[in-house]
A protein has these predicted regions:
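C-terminal alpha-helix
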Residues: 181, 185-189
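Structural/interface elements that position substrates and couple domains in central-metabolism enzymes
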Residues: 191-193
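Active-site C-terminal subdomain of aminotransferase-like
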Residues: 1-105, 109-137
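Pyridoxal 5′-phosphate
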Residues: 168
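Short glycine-enriched loop/turn motifs at secondary-structure junctions
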Residues: 100-102, 161-164
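Short, amphipathic alpha-helical "lid/cap" segments that border enzyme active or binding sites
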Residues: 175-179
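Conserved small/polar residues in nucleotide/adenosyl-binding loops
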Residues: 196-198
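Flexible, small-/acidic-enriched active-site or ligand-binding loops
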Residues: 128-161
Length: 198
């Protein structure tokens, strides 16, 4: 923003717009790259999604609260991280600023480490093994055996990850269906590695 921008005849956004430089640059580049208005289909998709957002978030948050309780009491789970979880450092703040729910993202540690995490992921069927979040479907990923599998121990730790961590984005399915699916995954994670179908 402080250097002359060739795409705008050498304009320096910082010099020209001062404190609003970032806003002006984002606006100018957005207009250049995407045009001044949405395509009709894109506008319809956004509107269609917004109309049911509050209902979907209610279900996401409800399922997440139940999931935190389920995981917190499960013998195969070492730890649970979610703003509603007992002992979470931000629990009080989250309840104050997010009274209707703290979202559907949960991280938990599976007992048995990397092998158990991989076995769990490969044996759930309802939950999708995907790296994205916020879907209508329940999504799970074991970063140590998937997205971050090339990292050594020190780099994993620096990234805030552990071999036992599973990231969960709770979906809109019936809660009992999610639990039944997770029970299949937990059973597989307890088997000796040679007996696990991966």
């Amino acid at each position: 923003m402080t250097e002359p921008y060739e795409g705008y005849h050498g304009l320096s956004f910082a010099e020209e717009f001062g404190p609003t430089a970032f806003t002006m640059m984002a606006r100018a580049e957005g207009m250049r790259d995407m045009g001044p208005c949405l395509a009709p289909q894109n506008a319809w998709n956004i509107l269609h999604g917004l109309e049911t957002l509050s209902l979907r978030m209610e279900k996401h948050c409800s399922n997440a609260l139940k999931m935190v309780e389920y995981l917190s009491n499960h013998e195969s789970v070492a730890w649970v991280s979610h703003a509603s979880a007992p002992g979470h450092p931000d629990k009080e703040l989250a309840e104050k600023i997010l009274p209707k729910g703290t979202g559907s993202m949960i991280a938990f540690g599976i007992k048995g480490g990397k092998e158990a995490g991989a076995a769990f992921i490969n044996n759930v069927k309802l939950a999708s093994h995907l790296a994205n979040v916020g879907d209508a479907r329940t999504l799970v990923i074991h970063p140590a055996s998937a997205t971050h599998s090339q990292m050594d121990e020190a780099t994993l730790k620096f990234a805030g990850l552990s071999h036992d961590m599973i990231r969960l984005s709770v979906g809109l399915e019936d809660f009992e269906d999610i639990v039944n699916d997770f029970e299949d995954g937990f059973r597989a994670a307890k088997k000796p590695l040679s007996l696990i179908h991966i």
